[in-house]
C-alpha cells in the first residue's frame, strides 16, 4: 500500500492514537491531544477525527476540566467491539496549581467523560501510557 500525509485542520495536536487492534490497516478514527492556546505544548483536551477517503474532519471534542492538562490517550477497546470506536480513551491529567492528578476515562464513540479516577500522588505532565488488557 501507500502512505500519504496531509493536514487535518489548523488546530495544533500531538501524539495521535488509534484503536491499536487495527494497527497496520486503514483507521476510520484518530484521537489527538489538543495543544492549549495559552500554554506551550500542554494539552487541554482530546479531538476525535473521522478519516474519510480524501479528507478528515474533527467530529467530537472532549475538553479537560478548567486548570487541568492531559497527555497522550490510550485506546481501551470494549470487549463487545461493535465498531472501531467502541471503547474508551484513557489519559492522565494534572492540575499543577492544585497539585492533583487523575486518570480520565472518555467514551471514544461519544467523547463524553465516563469516569474520573483521582490519583493519590501527582504525576508529571507528559506522562505516556499504553493499554494492556488483563489476562
Residue ranges and their predicted role:
Residues 1-135:
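Beta-propeller domains
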Amino acid at each position: 500500500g501507500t502512505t500519504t500525509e496531509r493536514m487535518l485542520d489548523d488546530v495544533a495536536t500531538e501524539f495521535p492514537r488509534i484503536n491499536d487492534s487495527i494497527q497496520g490497516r486503514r483507521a476510520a478514527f484518530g484521537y489527538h491531544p489538543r495543544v492549549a492556546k495559552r500554554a506551550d505544548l500542554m494539552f487541554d483536551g482530546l479531538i476525535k477525527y473521522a478519516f474519510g477517503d480524501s479528507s478528515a474532519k474533527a467530529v467530537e471534542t472532549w475538553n479537560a476540566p478548567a486548570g487541568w492538562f492531559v497527555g497522550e490517550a490510550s485506546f481501551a477497546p470494549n470487549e463487545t467491539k461493535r465498531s472501531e470506536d467502541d471503547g474508551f480513551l484513557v489519559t492522565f491529567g494534572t492540575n499543577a496549581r492544585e497539585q492533583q492528578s487523575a486518570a480520565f476515562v472518555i467514551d471514544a464513540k461519544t467523547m463524553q467523560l465516563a469516569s474520573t479516577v483521582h490519583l493519590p500522588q501527582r504525576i508529571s505532565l507528559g506522562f505516556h501510557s499504553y493499554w494492556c488488557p488483563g489476562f
